[in-house]
Amino acid sequence: MSNHDPISDMLTRIRNASQKKHTTTTIPGSKMSLSIAKVLQKEGFISEINEEGEGYKSQIILGLKYSGKNKFPTIRSMQRVSKPGLRIYKNTRALPKVLGGLGVAIISTSKGVMSDRDARKQGIGGEVLCYVY
């Protein structure tokens, strides 16, 4: 089955695994997925990233984080913003603050994929890929 939107597929896999309280989830490997996963790890939403395989058979295994004794998921919501049919671009001043700064907007810029905070610090805008909180 072909996948026309690998970013949405990645977000859905993470969302479903965290709702079922799985410790890890596997996503198809790509440079974009790996970049998004690194931003999520840097922001504290996932615990670890492991890559398996090479080429088109590569996979990324993500370790999910939970808090409290009831294992409440660290990721409460993930929303895709810019889609293949409707791309959303924002300049530095228009970059969104998710939940007043508690969440993260993941931005694809000319200097790579980064969080909205990093993009503001560097003074660059880009395509708003998703919101995570």
From Swiss-Prot:
PROSITE patterns: RIBOSOMAL_S8
InterPro entries linked: Ribosomal_uS8, Ribosomal_uS8_CS, Ribosomal_uS8_sf
Family statement drawn from the similarity comment of this UniProt entry: Belongs to the universal ribosomal protein uS8 family.
Reported function: One of the primary rRNA binding proteins, it binds directly to 16S rRNA central domain where it helps coordinate assembly of the platform of the 30S subunit.
Quaternary structure note: Part of the 30S ribosomal subunit. Contacts proteins S5 and S12.
Record's protein name: Small ribosomal subunit protein uS8
GO MF terms held by the record: rRNA binding; structural constituent of ribosome
Species whose genome carries this gene: Prochlorococcus marinus (strain MIT 9215)
Bilayer-crossing regions: none
Keyword list, A-Z: Ribonucleoprotein, Ribosomal protein, RNA-binding, rRNA-binding
Gene designation per UniProt: rpsH
Record GO biological process: translation
GO cellular component: ribonucleoprotein complex; ribosome
